[in-house]
């Protein structure tokens, strides 16, 4: 796993083999951030990374200048890894919550420019995530919600759906209120 761009461009992050995660591939992550480059200015934004896993997406946003990154991960080993890696990178702007995403979303914590979610592909209630995000106060009015998912799911009929991109087995659906 490597950081694609920004202050820590090219930095390799070695993850322990015992983490129960499927990190977003470098190819898919680079493609995602190429799209985001045309949608947002990374400087001084707030980002919420749900189902953060290894923190791969959180580190990329930090490297590109995000002011605040909140990582939510239920697995203790993963949350500890994100905290340790953030300390090593001196990423004081990354805050880690060891919590279920569904529990976290019930308690207003902040207001974000981008919310990224990479749930397990077999998550039973993945279809409910866009509605949970848009019914909460977490996303700014002009903010973006990006959901990584398998090809089994289509969100094109959701009222805030904006676009879909596919990179190998990785699918990203983009949502925005405006």
How would you label these PLM feature ranges?
Residues 1-178:
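Class I S-adenosyl-L-methionine-dependent methyltransferase catalytic core
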């Amino acid at each position: 796993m490597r950081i694609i761009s920004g202050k820590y461009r090219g930095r390799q992050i070695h993850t322990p083999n015992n983490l129960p995660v499927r990190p977003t591939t470098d190819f898919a992550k680079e493609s995602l951030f190429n799209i985001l480059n045309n949608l947002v200015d990374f400087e001084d934004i707030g980002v919420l990374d749900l189902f953060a896993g290894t923190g791969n997406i959180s580190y990329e946003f930090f490297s590109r200048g995000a002011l605040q990154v909140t990582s939510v991960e239920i697995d203790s080993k993963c949350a500890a890894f994100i905290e340790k890696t953030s300390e090593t990178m001196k990423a004081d702007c990354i805050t880690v919550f060891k919590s279920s995403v569904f529990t976290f979303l019930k308690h207003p914590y902040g207001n974000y420019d981008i919310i990224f979610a990479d749930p397990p592909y077999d998550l039973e209630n993945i279809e409910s995530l866009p509605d949970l995000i848009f019914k909460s106060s977490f996303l700014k009015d002009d903010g973006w919600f990006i959901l990584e998912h398998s090809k089994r799911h289509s969100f094109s009929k959701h009222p805030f759906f904006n676009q879909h991109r596919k990179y190998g087995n990785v699918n990203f659906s983009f949502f925005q209120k405006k």
